[in-house]
């Protein structure tokens, strides 16, 4: 499609479920396994650019416990990589939203850096 051609020129790639990513920094380390653990540093933004969540200190997460958009993208990353993700609401918080911060049906933008991979 014309839109996906424009995306490719801008270095934006599409993953399953409509999750878009662009690589900000390449990684050469291990890739997470399904259900494994990941250590990440991230900033989460709403479509208007306002930050709704970020961690200054790297955090470990189990891939089973994160939003679907992360579950789609993180296993494709190598440790050391930093990606910008655009996640459709269906792969984020969907119709429910999240508290006062994220309205229902809101797509989310994350800059996520994969620091380390665990079992």
Question: Which ranges hold each PLM region?
Answer:
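N-terminal beta-hairpin/loop module of FHA
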Residues: 9-13
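FKBP-type peptidyl-prolyl cis-trans isomerase
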Residues: 16-28, 33-51, 67-118
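Well-structured core secondary-structure elements of compact alpha/beta domains
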Residues: 52-68
């Amino acid at each position: 499609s014309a839109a996906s051609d424009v995306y490719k020129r801008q270095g934006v790639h599409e993953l399953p479920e409509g999750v878009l990513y662009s690589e900000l920094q390449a990684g050469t380390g291990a890739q997470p396994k399904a259900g494994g653990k990941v250590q990440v540093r991230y900033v989460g933004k709403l479509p208007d650019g306002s930050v709704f969540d970020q961690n200054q200190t790297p955090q470990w997460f189990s891939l089973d416990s994160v939003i679907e958009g992360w579950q789609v993208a993180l296993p494709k990353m190598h440790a050391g990589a930093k990606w910008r993700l655009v996640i459709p609401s269906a792969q984020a918080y969907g119709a429910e939203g999240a508290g006062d911060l994220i309205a229902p049906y809101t797509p989310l933008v994350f800059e996520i850096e994969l620091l380390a991979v665990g079992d």
